[in-house]
């Protein structure tokens, strides 16, 4: 198992970057409204995709992004990825990764999880959140396949899921993992000061007891950053048979690495590519902050001395694209797309 603690010193301590090949596309942005499977209410998603035209700087929910808003999709066939953000978070906190992957030929649909986002935390600590988040990602996969703008340009292969923090838990459930709620209770007895995992003292609110963890056979690979995974032992992970790329920081003050990413990497039945970043904390995976964000959320912007967030993000963009290209098939340039070709049968 690749459990070597990859210190990635060049990335973390400001070593020189290898020249990056110029991205062949610009990142497009498409706004999507879906139906939340939990309560049948509208839910939002942002789709980043390889686009034609020119990108422009815009600001969405306080995050500056460079995109071509609702521009035509570039001609070709592209793998589909779905991004799941952390508890009370925003997919825009990972905009650098979504736009970077779009420029390299991936369609990235970033769900805003209802009841567990920066504006609305009402489902935090509930069963409807734990089991509803994967259902929302599955709904996003179906919606993307059926979307008039995106659908004709998606390849026929499996789908990748990117999960950050609690989004890692979501990705694992979609891959076949079965959460063990007793593990959460036991963990919170041992470490009651873990304010993030133990907000409800290890007992989730059974607001929707009829819900259950549901895997999605369309998922073919996962990329996890600082994953929340303490509810998964070996037995709970036995059905997870997809390739995984896992990143974590060894200075994560929010999620205990030994009980989350490190334990997960040991227990997955398919050996993951596990990369431990020296000195990095939980928030190193979030987009670099501008002056306004530094003033508003300093704790999320600041890294330990010697940790270079820009270099880490460059590595994430490059290596995530390579990982999904190998696992799902590489993006394909094309003079025409499925929109002008013969009808095909896609995985919906």
Task: Walk through the language-model features, giving the residues of each.
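Short substrate-entry loop that stabilizes the transition state in hydrolases
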Residues: 54-55, 66-78, 83-120, 253-257
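Acidic catalytic loop of the alpha/beta-hydrolase fold
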Residues: 230-231, 251-255, 282-283
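Domain-level recognition of soluble alpha/beta enzyme cores
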Residues: 23-83, 93
């Amino acid at each position: 198992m690749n459990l070597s603690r990859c210190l990635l010193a060049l990335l973390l301590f400001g070593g020189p970057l290898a020249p990056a090949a110029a991205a062949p596309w610009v990142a497009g942005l498409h706004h999507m409204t879906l139906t939340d499977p939990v309560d049948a209410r509208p839910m939002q998603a942002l789709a980043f995709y390889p686009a034609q035209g020119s990108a422009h700087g815009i600001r969405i929910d306080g995050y500056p992004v460079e995109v071509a808003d609702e521009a035509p999709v570039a001609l070709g066939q592209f793998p589909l990825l779905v991004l799941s953000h952390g508890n009370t978070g925003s997919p825009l906190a990972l905009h650098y990764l979504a736009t970077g992957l779009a420029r390299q030929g991936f369609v990235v649909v970033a769900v805003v999880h209802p009841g567990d986002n920066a504006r609305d935390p009402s489902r935090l600590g509930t069963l409807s959140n734990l089991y509803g988040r994967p259902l929302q990602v599955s709904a996003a996969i179906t919606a993307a396949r059926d979307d008039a703008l995106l659908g004709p340009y998606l390849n026929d292969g499996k789908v990748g899921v990117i999960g950050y923090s609690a989004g890692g838990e979501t990705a694992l459930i979609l891959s076949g993992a079965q959460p063990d709620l007793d593990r959460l209770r036991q963990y919170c007895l041992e470490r009651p000061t873990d304010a993030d995992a133990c907000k409800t003292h290890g007992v989730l609110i059974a607001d929707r007891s009829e819900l259950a963890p549901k895997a999605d056979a369309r998922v073919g690979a996962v990329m996890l950053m600082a994953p929340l995974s303490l509810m998964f032992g070996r037995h709970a992970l036995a059905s997870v048979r997809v390739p995984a790329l896992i990143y974590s920081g060894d200075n994560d003050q929010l999620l205990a690495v030994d009980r989350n990413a490190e334990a997960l990497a040991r227990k997955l039945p398919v050996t993951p590519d596990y990369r431990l970043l020296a000195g990095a904390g939980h928030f190193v995976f979030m987009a670099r902050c501008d002056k306004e964000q530094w003033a508003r959320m300093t704790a999320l912007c600041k890294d330990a001395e010697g940790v270079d967030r820009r270099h880490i993000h460059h590595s994430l963009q490059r290596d995530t694209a390579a990982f999904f290209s190998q696992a799902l098939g590489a993006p394909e340039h094309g003079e025409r797309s499925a929109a002008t070709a013969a009808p095909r049968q896609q995985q919906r």
